[in-house]
Structure formats: C-alpha cells, structure tokens
A protein has these predicted regions:
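Extracytoplasmic small-molecule ligand-binding "clamshell" domains
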Residues: 1-23, 158
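Short helix-initiation/N-cap motifs at beta->coil->alpha
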Residues: 1-4, 87-101
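A ligand-binding cleft/hinge motif common to bilobed small-molecule-binding domains
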Residues: 13-26, 108-128
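Solvent-exposed loop/turn segments at secondary-structure junctions
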Residues: 19-22, 50, 72-76, 93, ...
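A conserved helix-loop-strand patch within extracytoplasmic ligand-binding domains
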Residues: 32-77
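Periplasmic-binding protein-like
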Residues: 36-42, 123-156, 181-205, 212-217
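Ligand-binding cleft/hinge of the Venus flytrap
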Residues: 55-61, 71-91, 118-126, 230
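Ligand-binding clefts/hinges and TM-proximal coupling segments of bilobed small-molecule sensing domains
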Residues: 70-81, 162-230
Length: 231
C-alpha cells in the first residue's frame, strides 16, 4: 500500500504503524487511530507459567525469557532493540503453537486485540494458553492514516474530522462500544499494573494530545515517560 500511495494509484488513504520510513515517503496524519495504546502489550503465556510471571519485577528478568513475534512485524525490531530475546515466526497463528511447545515464553499482544484473540484461540485449541495482563510491556507506537505527499487538502480534511471526533467524544464511543475493544473499559481495570517501558527507535515520538488521546486517560499514564524509555 505504501507504493500505491506514493504513486497515487488505487488508494487515497491507508492506515499503518508509525515509522520514519513511511513518514519520509507519505503524509502521516498525526491523530492516533487507537488513541496511543497500540504499544501497550499484555502477554499471552502458558497457564502453568502464571506464578513465574507474577514474580517478574524488572525488565532485566523479562530479558531472560523469550518472546514470540512474527518476523515481519515492527514490534520484533522494537523488542530486539531493547535487548529482549525474540523467537521469530512466519505466520501469526504459529506464535501460539510455538508458545505451547516451549519455543518461547510469552507472546506480547496489544491490549486492544489480545482479549478477542485469546478467546478465539481457546475456542479452537483449548485452555493451555491464557492472557496475562498484570504485567504490561509499553512502548511508543502510533497508528496513523497516510496519504500521498501531494494530497495536502485530503490530509487536512481528515485531520480536522478526527480532531472533531476526539473533541466531541464520538471517537472514544466507537472504541467503548466496538466488540473487539469494549473490554478495555472501565479504564479503572488498569490500575495497579506493573509496567516495563521500552524505547521505539523506529518512529518519531510526538508529544501531542492527539498522539496519545486515549492513553492519557489510563490510570498508569503518569508512570509513562517515553523520553526515559529503556534500550
């Protein structure tokens, strides 16, 4: 889709994770489509490992374990840049199988998607794996809309509309009511979680309201300082 937008054929707008490379080629509309929570990761783990994860109290301890990730995901490079060990897979579903077989110890998933994914997994394959959300791995990772560099008018119009949706509450309402993301609420559920904040060397960090408009409402937001994120 990047090439199609660059060449201004077939597509007028597309969504994707933030990166220096994409922002160099396209106009990124800096209104986060998930409110800044894309980089907030819970862990899919083996059910028998719950106690082990209860006892993880530092990033150094997590670095002794191995994450499963798809080899082509930006998250893989983000984790490796912070010194986390990663077992790479070619297909999304393979991550669950590798975790079952002990090839890795955890599979980090965005909190907006993890609950529906583990529910689907358990229906298909049983209850060997669970979602562990007492420990969150957090890194800055935005989700932008992109348009061709020559399409300034479209970019401005989309930015105006998204800002209006944030300000009138309708954007948040979509996330609150969508069946994939409604489990995030009430946000008080996220009080008292253990956080490990790491750096993202792949994107420009924007300190704007629109980049983190939903994340700012989470009870742990004040614990996050991306400028002090660890490598």
């Amino acid at each position: 889709w990047i090439r199609m937008l660059e060449q201004n054929v077939y597509l007028d707008v597309a969504w994707g994770g933030a990166s220096f490379a994409r922002e160099d080629k396209l106009i990124a509309i800096p209104i986060d489509l998930l409110g800044g929570i894309l980089g907030v990761r819970a862990m899919v783990i083996r059910r028998d490992d719950r106690l082990k994860f209860n006892n993880i109290t530092s990033l150094a301890m997590l670095k002794k374990l191995t994450a499963c990730q798809a080899e082509h995901w930006p998250d893989t490079a983000i984790l490796e840049a912070s010194g986390l060990k990663v077992h790479k897979t070619a297909i999304f579903e393979t991550n669950f199988r590798m975790l079952e077989k002990g090839r890795c110890d955890y599979f980090p998933r965005g909190i907006h998607e993890a609950y529906s994914e583990i529910e689907k997994y358990q229906i298909l394959w049983g209850n060997q794996l669970i979602l562990y959300d007492e420990l969150l791995l957090v890194y800055p990772f935005n989700m932008w809309l992109y348009v061709n560099k020559e399409n300034q008018a479209l970019a401005q119009r989309i930015e105006y509309g998204l800002k209006q949706a944030i300000n009138d509450g309708s954007f948040k309402k979509i996330i609150q009511t969508h069946p994939v993301t409604n489990h995030l609420f009430p946000l008080a559920h996220w009080q008292g979680k253990r956080l490990f904040v790491i750096n993202n060397p792949l994107q420009n960090i924007r300190n704007t309201k629109e980049a983190w408009w939903l994340l700012r409402e989470f009870p742990f937001y004040q614990q996050i300082d991306f400028s002090q994120a660890k490598d």
